[in-house]
Amino acid sequence: MTAHSFALPVIIFTTFWGLVGIAGPWFVPKGPNRGVIITMLVATAVCCYLFWLIAILAQLNPLFGPQLKNETIWYVRFLWE
């Protein structure tokens, strides 16, 4: 994965969830539950962004690769040729 193809989604998703968490509370109507709704919006933005970030970083540098037996590797190679 090149630096450009990784940086663009990170910038886009960071901007999106930043807008949801920062600009979203400005559009909540006044009422008795306004504080609860704002808290829910900010918590949702933070949780969704962290979930996405952890998932994309785990795919970027995995801790271990697929565990294949030699017979499986030879069979796959035979089928692909």
UniProtKB/Swiss-Prot annotation:
Keywords noted in UniProt: Cytoplasmic vesicle, Glycoprotein, Hydrogen ion transport, Ion transport, Membrane, Synapse, Transmembrane, Transmembrane helix, Transport
GO MF annotation terms: ATPase-coupled ion transmembrane transporter activity; proton-transporting ATPase activity, rotational mechanism
Cytoplasmic side: 29-35
The keyword Transmembrane belongs to this UniProt entry's keyword annotation: yes
Tissue expression remark: Isoform 1 is expressed at high levels in heart, brain and kidney and also detected in inner ear epithelium, vestibule, testis, epididymis and bladder. Isoform 2 is expressed in heart, kidney, placenta and pancreas. Isoform 2 is not detected in frontal cortex, but is prevalent in all other brain areas.
GO cellular component: clathrin-coated vesicle membrane; endosome membrane; lysosomal membrane; membrane; phagocytic vesicle membrane; synaptic vesicle membrane; vacuolar proton-transporting V-type ATPase, V0 domain
Pfam families per UniProt: ATP_synt_H
Membrane topology category: Multi-pass membrane protein
Any GO BP: transmembrane transport
Entries under InterPro entries matching the protein: ATPase_V0-cplx_e1/e2_su (IPR008389), ATPase_V0-cplx_e1/e2_su_met (IPR017385)
Subcellular location: Membrane; Cytoplasmic vesicle, Clathrin-coated vesicle membrane; Cytoplasmic vesicle, Secretory vesicle, Synaptic vesicle membrane
Protein family: Belongs to the V-ATPase e1/e2 subunit family.
Function: Subunit of the V0 complex of vacuolar(H+)-ATPase (V-ATPase), a multisubunit enzyme composed of a peripheral complex (V1) that hydrolyzes ATP and a membrane integral complex (V0) that translocates protons. V-ATPase is responsible for acidifying and maintaining the pH of intracellular compartments and in some cell types, is targeted to the plasma membrane, where it is responsible for acidifying the extracellular environment.
Protein name according to UniProt: V-type proton ATPase subunit e 2
